[in-house]
Amino acid sequence: MEGNAKVIAVTGKGGVGKTSLAAGVVRRLTQRYPDAKILAIDADPAVGLATALDAKVKETLDDIRLEITQGVSEKLKDTQDILSEARFRLLDMMDEEKGFAFVAIGRPESSGCYCAINSYLRDVISMLAGQFDYVVIDGEAGIEQVNRRVMEQVTHLLLVTDQSRKGLQVIQTIKDVADRLVMYERLGVAVNRITQDVIPFGNPFPDAPFVEIRNDEAQIVNDIQGKSVFELPEECELLKGADGILDALGI
């Protein structure tokens, strides 16, 4: 990976609020570093980050991947020409409003394995990271993308859980896989949506910073009303959590 981009991957079990936290991190980065080049990647086929950031999705990575595959297989153009055109379209498709660029993985039309799009996503992360100062990736729930080395060039890995044992087990599994396959420099743990004063477990990784984020009524209302993270009040729990995450990761 070229350059010194900080690539932050937000991972965890589905339903723990990682997409909202990823959006909060993007908002805080735009505020802390207004002159920096920031890229948000929605790597979850559910496409929740686009909604959370109110980002326009012109095309998705899967749209471009399909055209590359078709062009190469049908030999419509020289392979290098196709790849060069794909790179140009990738840069052109990125929404760069609100102080950040945005790319979505998309949802493959065919059912079954996401191997092809995950492989393409890995290459895209490697290519784009050198052109940005900060990259925030909202990963697919679970370990699939980590296991397929989509995240192998991530520099900062954030593990998000709630107060449940299942959420804890998922981030423990993600860390086990990431320790073998991801070249991360810093690791952080965020316990999100805390509704009780006592968390039923301590920091599972004593060497990693541990951020506690209380349940956020403002963010819940925001979601119900279909508003973006940029419409949340400055002092809400979600944005306090995003600040804590960036501080914990040394960003």
PLM regions and their residue ranges:
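Walker A (P-loop) phosphate-binding loop of P-loop NTPases
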Residues: 15
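Conserved catalytic-core segment of NTP-binding enzymes
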Residues: 31-34, 116-221
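N-terminal phosphate/diphosphate-binding loop that engages ATP/GTP or pyrophosphate donors
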Residues: 28-96
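Cytosolic-facing regulatory segments adjacent to core modules
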Residues: 83-97, 101-137
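Hydrophobic anchor at the beta1->P-loop junction of P-loop NTPases
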Residues: 10
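Conserved lysine of the Walker
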Residues: 18
